[in-house]
Structure formats: C-alpha cells, structure tokens
Design a protein with these regions (language model features):
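Alpha/beta-hydrolase superfamily serine-hydrolase fold, recognizing
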Residues: 1-294
Length: 294
C-alpha cells in the first residue's frame, strides 16, 4: 500500500502530457526532469558527452575511491523518443554514489532514428564499456545493464539480440517498469493515445515489427539467454505493469533467475522521484541484488 508520505509527494508533482508536438514534448520532458535532478549526490566525477562513436554519446558518472569499480550501463526511459542522460542525471549519479561506474547512454531517438537505431546503440555500448571501463579504473568484465520504461525494453533486447560473446559480458539486468511485448502492450492500451503514438513512432509506423523479438524481447526469452534480472513494476501503472509480470512469468518458465518487486500504488516513472519512500525501498533491494550478482 502506498504511504501517505508518497501520496502527498505525488499529488504535488507536475503532470507531463504525452501527446502533441514532439519538440514541445521533449522540452517539457527536460523541464520536468529539472524537478527531479535536485540535490545531486557527491561522486568522484561526472564526464558529460563522452563520445562512444560518431553520433553516440553518454554521460559517465564516476564513483569515489580507487576501484576497480563494477559498471552499470543505464538506458533512460522516454518512449524511445524523449529523455536523455540529462533527464536521468541524478539517477546515474546515485549509481555512482553506490560505487558503480555508470554510463548513461544518449541513444538515438525516434522519430528521427526509429528502430533499430536505439537497439544498435545499446548493443554497441556493451562492447564499448568492456573495452573502455579501465579508463575510469573500472572492471570491464563486471557489467550490469539497466533501464526504465523504454530503457528497460532496450536493456533486455540488447542482451537477447547480441551474439553469445557480447551477451556473456552482462552479469545482471535491473529493469524498471519496462515494455517487453509491444504487441500485447499496444493491444492492452488502446485507450491511451499518447502511448499508442510512442509505440508506433518507435517502429516508424510499421507495427508488424511488434512481433519481432528485437522489438518485443519477451518473445526471445529462452533458457540461458538472460542474466539474473531484477524486475520492478509500478503498481499504479496501466502502461507497463503487465509487461513486468509477463517477463517474470516467462523467466520462471525457463528457470532463469529473477526477482520481481511491485511497488503498490506507485505510478510509472517513479525511479526519477528520489524523494519517494517507494524509490528508496526499490533502490535498497536493487543494491542487494547487484552486490550478489555483479
């Protein structure tokens, strides 16, 4: 059950409208993120706009201490069309505060760069992290990947779509209210025009792609494919809660290790809301999971 503390905070937050002009939506998304990116934690350093290759950059949040540090590759949410390393800056720095070199990827966005651009960027980032982590005294063979919403989709898709040698680099996945079966999500959310538009935009209107396991990675779950997964669903999430439950069920069916936690009464997007008790509870559980698996 949601706490009164969290209920009060959520009632005061501005509302983002996921419809309308893409430029205006992106501007509103980044403005809303300034509300979340206050009281940034103290870390070893933050390197902005690090170039991974032409057209692909990331913010790299560096922990304090000598290392070698484990690595987290983080994929921001935003319907494959919004968001940036800046919108998720505080979350990336919180990973670094906990001792993880954190690469918050600025993957290419739709509609300018529809599928498979963001997925290709994510897959490239895994190999890049393995090869370059030592630049920040970090361990290129102790990598976790994570993401929220669309970022959760990309995290799972990157693992299931990669060759075995690349897939083996990822020791764990942390997944917050992701979309893992876009075909089912689109059917379930017909009454939500904003989400329908985001889903369609990601695949450039070619909704047949929803059946592609690179787009809907739930269809690629099989024994030995995914590392241990930490799955968090938002209890008050009409968009993606069913996806989190379905992923857990699919992993259970193939005896693949996972944890599932549903934060009751909490909305989609809460992993940017660090003042929530539900956020702090999810983070405590995640630190324990990562300590065991990375």
């Amino acid at each position: 059950m949601i706490s009164e503390h969290d209920r009060q905070i959520l009632s005061q937050l501005p509302v983002w409208d996921p419809t309308g002009d893409i430029v205006a939506q992106r501007r509103a998304w980044e403005e809303l993120a300034t509300v979340y990116n206050q009281d940034l934690p103290a870390i070893g350093g933050l390197e902005k706009n690090v170039e991974l290759r032409s057209g692909l950059r990331a913010d790299v949040a560096v922990p304090k201490g000598a290392g070698p540090h484990p690595v987290v590759i983080y994929l921001h949410g935003g319907g494959w069309a919004f968001g940036s390393p800046t919108s998720h800056r505080k979350l990336g720095m919180q990973f670094a505060e906990a001792g993880y070199l954190t690469i918050v990827l600025g993957y290419r966005l739709a509609p300018e760069h529809p599928f498979p651009a963001a997925l290709e960027d994510t897959m490239f980032a895994i190999g890049w992290a393995a090869d370059n982590a030592r630049r920040w005294n970090s361990h290129g063979r102790r990598i976790a990947i994570g993401g929220d919403s669309a970022g959760g989709n990309l995290a799972v898709s990157a693992i299931t779509s990669s060759a075995p040698e690349l897939r083996s680099l990822v020791r764990a996945a942390v997944l917050f209210y992701g979309a893992y079966d876009l075909e089912a999500t689109a059917e379930r959310t017909r009454s939500l025009p904003g989400l329908q538009e985001q889903l369609s935009t990601y695949v450039s209107g070619k909704r047949d792609f929803f059946d592609d396991p690179r787009v809907s990675p739930l269809k690629a779950v099989a024994p030995g494919i995914l590392p241990p997964c930490f799955i968090v669903g938002a209890g008050d999430d009409s968009w993606c809660l069913a996806d989190s439950l379905a992923l857990a069920q699919a992993l259970s069916a193939v005896a693949s290790p996972y944890e599932l936690h549903v934060m009751e009464g909490i909305p989609h997007g809460f992993m940017q809301m660090s003042t929530l008790e539900a956020f702090r509870a999810a983070m405590r559980l995640m630190w324990e999971f990562l300590a065991r698996n990375v």
